[in-house]
Regions:
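Flexible "cap/lid" loop of the alpha/beta hydrolase fold
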Residues: 1-20, 47-50, 54, 76, ...
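Short beta-strand/loop motif that positions the catalytic acidic residue
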Residues: 61, 66-69
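Helix-loop "lid/cap" segments that line or gate small-molecule binding pockets
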Residues: 20-30
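Short, amphipathic alpha-helical "lid/cap" segments that border enzyme active or binding sites
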Residues: 106-114
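Conserved loop-alpha-helix segment in the C-terminal half of the alpha/beta-hydrolase fold
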Residues: 71-97, 103, 115-116
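Short, hydrophobic alpha-helical segments
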Residues: 113-124
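Active-site nucleophile elbow and catalytic-triad environment of alpha/beta-hydrolase enzymes
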Residues: 38-59
């Protein structure tokens, strides 16, 4: 895990929360700080167990896959993302962004989603 997740607050119900400083400066580092603070204020916790549980058979084993590598991600290291994508056989794009690419680079994310949707539609 990267610095965005280095200081998680785990509550009594075993939910993980990202502290404000880490959220603004690492998790959503390429956003305007005001927008990042709004996102921090409305964040939903992640069950702590989710970071270590095996979730069953991954869909990428049987379905076409597209993957966006966020080369400035401070939550999931970009090197790990670059390793995951080929293992999945994913069509991959790399964007200079942080973990919240869907907010900071919505056009690039939309383009990747459209590419995947069009490829699947053409194959059926």
């Amino acid at each position: 895990m990267g610095p965005a997740l280095a200081h998680l607050d785990i509550d009594q119900q075993r939910f993980a929360w990202i502290p404000e400083d880490d959220f603004v400066n690492h998790f959503a580092a390429d956003l305007d700080p005001v927008k990042a603070r709004v996102m921090f204020a409305v964040q939903q916790p992640l069950p702590w167990s989710a970071l270590g549980e095996v979730m069953g058979v991954p869909a990428w084993k049987s379905l076409p896959t597209w993957f966006l590598v966020a080369d400035g991600d401070q939550a999931i290291p970009p090197a790990a993302q670059r390793q995951f994508a080929p293992r999945m056989g994913a069509t991959t794009v790399e964007v200079s962004t942080n973990h919240v690419a869907m907010v900071s680079h919505p056009d690039e994310v939309l383009r990747l989603i459209k590419t995947g949707a069009e490829a699947v539609a053409a194959a059926t």
